[in-house]
Curated annotation (Swiss-Prot):
Disulfide bonds: none annotated. This is UPF0210 protein MmarC5_0151. InterPro entries: UPF0210 (IPR007841). HAMAP family: UPF0210. It comes from the Archaea. Pfam families: DUF711. CDD domains: RNR_PFL_like_DUF711. Belongs to the UPF0210 family.
Length: 458
């Protein structure tokens, strides 16, 4: 039995506190699309995705209207393309292989535009130990792909707790990010490239979503969003002890997650596919009040980034997970609090006033998901420094048995004090300083950082 107060509370969450379903993401298996002939491969991919996803946007909109809950993004993720290119690329020169990979990426982009989804993820390679020849070609093709597509997202998993860190891949990804920044407007291509440690197979969020090899043929995964709701709750708890704050956040996360599961299951049922998971991640937007940083400040920090930020974030992340896990048996993806600088109005302000630096963000990634996200750095930053930043973040994920990632944007012609405007969900990125001391010798060593002792769990 619902009481009027609960109904009013739900209306407030949606109308005034920016509560929404951030994404319903359709995962599609493409393993059965592989073919020696490039044209047949592209045709198979087109037929498979459109057969499952042709009505995704229409269905999500219908469910959104039925429940009065906004579904902000409709997206598609596919099997990592690096896993299905082997037979197609056999016998081709390196240049031909790169072009073939890009053609597949363009096919994905055309499909995304035809079915009306915001992004399509899965232009991906899983190279945590070593890369196959086709995966090397796919990685090499990423900068060119970003100049020719609008909606395709690329991700590369270069480390896991079980495998260690592939430092050859880390070095290469620094170079790929640098090259992409130089050939796409305002380095926008870099906003669609993520480097992972312990990448989840069922992540609904971009730019890191792909349909993992262990998944079924098609599945709907939902991602919720509710920083504004959590902030409103915390602001009512002035003077309460931190345990009480945690408990109230937990209750709020429960309600948010229930809504996400309801909508996700309904969309899956309408499409005739399985329901996968709800991702519990609190995902901010550039909208005022829809900010993770503002939640931390409501807990008691003058500015996000000051001493105590990591502790407050750890409490927030844990409370969200506990509340969400109670609300759903189908929790997965990244499931934490996102801290993307350019997509969070409070984070942007904290950087601009000098409260939040790259080193503090790195510490914060130890206790939340997912990593250094949407970080803009000076365009003059060398590729080796980008690789070293990636390596540090991969080490945090590997040792702590958690997902970490890096989405970093070296913006040509920009330096500390400048900012770059992307608009929409990508927001505004203030340029953050990086160390001027070199890490080049470390990165040039290559090889593999061995898996840590805590990987031996059997």
């Amino acid at each position: 039995m619902y009481v009027p107060e609960e109904i009013i509370e739900t209306i407030k969450m949606i109308e005034y506190q920016n509560l929404d379903i951030r994404t319903t993401t359709l995962g599609v298996n493409l393993k059965d699309c592989a073919d020696k002939d490039l044209d047949l491969l592209k045709e198979n991919i087109y037929n498979k995705i459109t057969s499952y996803g042709g009505n995704l946007v229409e269905t999500a909109n219908k469910v959104s209207q039925k429940y009065g809950i906004p579904i902000v993004n409709k997206r598609i993720s596919v099997t990592p393309i690096g896993l299905i290119m082997g037979s197609t690329l056999k016998g081709l020169s390196n240049e031909e292989a790169v072009d073939a990979c890009v053609e597949v990426g363009i096919t994905l982009d055309n499909i995304a535009k035809e079915v009306g989804v915001d992004f399509i993820g899965g232009y991906s390679a899983l190279v945590q130990k070593r890369a196959t020849p086709e995966e090397k070609m796919l990685i090499r093709s990423i900068p060119k792909l970003m100049t020719k597509t609008d909606r395709v997202c690329a991700s590369v998993n270069v480390a896991t707790t079980k495998a260690g860190i592939n430092m050859y891949a880390v070095k290469k990804m620094g170079e790929i990010v640098k090259e992409t920044s130089e050939i796409t407007k305002d380095a926008i291509g870099c906003a669609k490239i993520v480097v992972f440690c312990n990448a989840p197979e069922d992540n609904p969020f971009m730019a890191g979503a792909f349909h993992g090899p262990g998944e079924g043929d098609a599945v709907i995964n939902a991602g919720v969003s509710g920083p504004g709701v959590v902030r409103a709750v915390v602001e009512q708890l002035k003077g309460k002890d931190i345990g009480t704050v945690s408990d109230e956040i937990k209750k709020t996360a429960f309600k948010i997650t229930r809504m996400g599961e309801l909508v996700g299951k309904e969309v899956a049922s309408e499409l005739g596919v399985d329901f996968g998971i709800v991702d519990l991640s609190l995902a901010p937007t550039p909208a005022i009040g829809d900010s993770i940083a503002n939640i931390l400040e409501a807990v008691g920090l003058e500015r996000c980034g000051t001493h105590g930020t990591t502790a407050a974030l750890a409490m927030l992340n844990d409370a969200v997970k506990k509340g969400g896990a109670m609300a759903s048996s189908n929790v997965g993806g990244l499931s934490g609090a996102f801290i993307p600088v350019s997509e969070d109005a409070g984070m942007i302000e904290a950087v601009e006033v000098g409260a939040l630096r790259l080193e503090k963000l790195e510490a914060m990634t130890c206790v939340c998901s997912v990593g250094l996200d949407m970080i803009a750095v000076p365009g003059k930053t060398p590729a080796s420094t980008l690789s070293a930043i990636i390596a540090d973040e991969m080490a945090i994920g590997m040792i702590n048995k958690k997902t970490t990632a890096v989405r970093i944007i070296p913006v040509p012609g920009k330096d500390v004090g400048d900012s770059v405007e992307y608009g929409g969900l990508l927001g505004t990125a203030p340029i953050m300083p990086v160390s001027e001391f070199s890490s080049e010798e470390l990165i040039e060593r290559g090889g593999r950082i061995p898996a840590p002792i805590q990987s031996l769990t059997n």
